[in-house]
């Protein structure tokens, strides 16, 4: 059975663990770099990207997460996870630099502009994915290496590149585990 870690610094950690388990894998909380040992994949949950980055630096997790990805292990970032995984963040904040695109933080607005939308996701059949956007980012300027999986208002809200999968929305806050199953079956 595949072993997936969830970076447990803040955000919807328990919801991701439930989603991983519902998709048929074992889930583990990751708080320190040694927690990455033996994992097949990693989830970077939503939360506040600046705070998450500061905590990752405090616990010396930035370089170990980069090394995890460079070993070819899969990483799934949602919302703040998308921001942290991007090569660049608008405004010049430090990132992990693992996805060849630029992240626009809070691209759809602040908390009061949060919304839900039915998305067509390229890797699914025709049934829409009910997506929850909370202070959501989006991506711009993807390289040719990046596959766009979904857009809202012509803004990139889901993408993948090699072993990296990102969404601007929160699949863990729905009952639809198709994205987690895709991550487990196609990327891990």
Curated annotation (Swiss-Prot):
Q: In which pathway does it act?
A: Cofactor biosynthesis; pyridoxal 5'-phosphate biosynthesis
A single GO BP: glutamine catabolic process
Q: Which SUPFAM superfamilies match?
A: Class I glutamine amidotransferase-like (SSF52317)
Reaction catalysed?
Answer: aldehydo-D-ribose 5-phosphate + D-glyceraldehyde 3-phosphate + L-glutamine = pyridoxal 5'-phosphate + L-glutamate + phosphate + 3 H2O + H(+); L-glutamine + H2O = L-glutamate + NH4(+)
Active site residues of this protein: 79 (nucleophile), 170 (charge relay system), 172 (charge relay system)
Pfam families per record: SNO (PF01174)
Show the GO cellular component annotation of the record. cytosol; glutaminase complex
The EC designation for this entry is 4.3.3.6, 3.5.1.2
Nucleus: is it a keyword of this entry? no
Q: Where L-glutamine is bound, by residue?
A: 47-49, 105, 134-135
**The organism sits in which domain of life?**
Bacteria
Quaternary state and interactors: In the presence of PdxS, forms a dodecamer of heterodimers. Only shows activity in the heterodimer.
What does the function comment of this entry state?
A: Catalyzes the hydrolysis of glutamine to glutamate and ammonia as part of the biosynthesis of pyridoxal 5'-phosphate. The resulting ammonia molecule is channeled to the active site of PdxS.
Protein's recorded name:
Pyridoxal 5'-phosphate synthase subunit PdxT
Write down the species: Listeria innocua serovar 6a (strain ATCC BAA-680 / CLIP 11262)
């Amino acid at each position: 059975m595949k072993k997936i870690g969830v970076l447990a610094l803040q955000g919807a950690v328990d919801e991701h663990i439930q989603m991983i388990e519902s998709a048929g894998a074992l889930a583990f909380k990751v708080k320190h770099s040694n927690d990455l040992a033996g994992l097949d994949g990693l989830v970077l949950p939503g939360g506040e990207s600046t705070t998450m980055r500061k905590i990752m630096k405090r616990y010396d997790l930035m370089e170990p997460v980069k090394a995890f990805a460079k070993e070819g292990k899969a990483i799934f970032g949602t919302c703040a996870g998308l921001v942290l995984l991007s090569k660049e963040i608008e405004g010049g904040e430090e990132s992990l630099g693992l996805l060849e695109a630029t992240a626009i933080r809070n691209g759809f607005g602040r908390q009061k502009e949060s919304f839900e939308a039915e998305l067509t996701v390229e890797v699914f059949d025709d049934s829409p994915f009910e997506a929850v956007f909370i202070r959501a980012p989006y991506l711009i300027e993807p390289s040719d290496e990046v596959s766009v999986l979904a857009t809202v208002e012509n803004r990139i809200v889901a993408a993948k590149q090699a072993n990296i999968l990102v969404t601007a929305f929160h699949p863990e806050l729905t009952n639809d585990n198709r994205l987690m199953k895709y991550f487990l079956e196609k990327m891990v």
